[in-house]
From Swiss-Prot:
Keyword Transport: yes
Family: Belongs to the ATPase epsilon chain family.
Keywords: ATP synthesis, Cell membrane, CF(1), Hydrogen ion transport, Ion transport, Membrane, Transport
Superkingdom as given in the UniProt entry: Bacteria
GO cellular component: plasma membrane; proton-transporting ATP synthase complex
InterPro entries: ATP_F1_dsu/esu_C_sf, ATP_synth_F1_dsu/esu, ATP_synth_F1_dsu/esu_N, ATP_synth_F1_esu_C, ATPsynth_dsu/esu_N
Main location: membrane
Protein name per the record: ATP synthase epsilon chain
Length: 133
């Protein structure tokens, strides 16, 4: 089976670069599975895990928004933030989740604060899910 090159890039630099059999990303329209020779496209990403499958193994990268650019031989993910599980501070992610939940439960907030807290909660849950903890 042929492979496809994957690059995950943030404003801080490259997070992942490698060849995989399949990439699964979460776009605003739903999950998208990408195999080698996929048609070209660009799609906006939501907060979620990028799954990188090679053989019987799977790696994940926690991504917080951005875009995916697909070409027949390469997938480039331009993310606002992205982390490999080994780079995630689980205690910090748990604390962020608790802060976001408490802000969501607060009665004194406007719509903007609510959306910020909701997004922070999604990011924290995604980071914890990717680490498996």
């Amino acid at each position: 089976m042929s492979t496809i090159r994957v690059n995950v890039v943030t404003p801080d630099g490259k997070v992942y670069d490698g060849d995989v059999d399949m990439v699964v990303v979460r776009t605003v329209e739903g999950e998208l599975g990408i195999l080698p020779k996929h048609i070209p496209l660009v799609a906006p990403l939501t907060v979620g895990a990028v799954r990188l499958k090679k053989g019987n193994s799977e790696e994940q990268v926690a991504v917080s928004g951005g875009f995916v650019e697909v070409r027949p031989d390469q997938v480039t993910i331009l993310a606002e933030a992205a982390e490999l599980p080994s780079a995630i501070d689980v205690d910090r992610a748990r604390a962020a989740k608790e802060r976001a939940e408490s802000r969501l439960n607060s009665t004194k907030q406007d719509a903007v604060d609510f959306k910020r807290a909701e997004l922070a909660l999604k990011r924290a849950i995604n980071r914890l899910d990717v680490t498996g903890k």
